[in-house]
Amino acid sequence: MKPVWLTVDTDDLRHVPKSQGHPTRSRGISQQGTSKQMLEAMRSFDTWLDKTQVSLTMFVIADQIDDPVFAQWLKGLLARHPQITVGCHGLTHKCWSAFPEDQDGLLAALVEADIKLHQFAGKAWRPWFRAPAGYIAPWMAPVIAKAGFELDSSVNPSWLVRRKAGPWRDWNAVQSALKDSGLVSRPWLCRLSLPTCGPALSIPFLAWNARRAWKRLGPFVNPYEAEDTVYWQLLDHGRKKGLWKPPLMLD
């Protein structure tokens, strides 16, 4: 068993790259506000968290705070679960490394997101960043640090998704840039050089591989004590008629 940092990304359907934030994949936002699927997932996540009482970090997109339905739900969740912390998943869900380098644009977005999320989350806020959809290039590292963040958890160090690592497609270059910028890096867990987090939890074979990796995880700790980091999507809790849960040794 290995100490692990549990994290959850709160993207709604309107945030996925096929809807927004990618120069070639996005086809337009399908809906505004909290989707029906997200509402169902939120209810199931509430039930799961009330039962397990685990400590985890939620990486929130700052524009979600503008949605009163989501904001009220998250505020209530944080009040009931003081063990939950909040990190930044961007101002919007823009996949920055898929676009030409724009340090000024990224800095402005990160500062605005930091202020917005910090004011909302209060004591639960942490200066931790996760790039939308895991798109992070080396040029982004010093900007993330300049915006006041201390830890980054964007790297998915698998060859299968190296296109997200900027023009060099090199995760080692991203990791080196994070280190040189003074940022603590917490990459996501891989097994057999394959992803085990996020979408990998529901893709055939990758899901089998992920379950094999996750069953060896625990206890659940903060990122500075963790040997591994995993994440899943809040939307996942709407799967299997609301009965889905992460493949952790909790029961």
Report residues per predicted region.
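Surface-exposed cleft-lining segments at the edges of enzyme active sites
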Residues: 28-33, 61, 125-127, 199-205
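Short acidic/His/Gly/Ser-rich catalytic and metal-binding motifs that mark active-site loops
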Residues: 13-18, 95-96, 195
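Conserved phosphate-coordination/catalytic loops
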Residues: 32-40, 104-108, 205-208
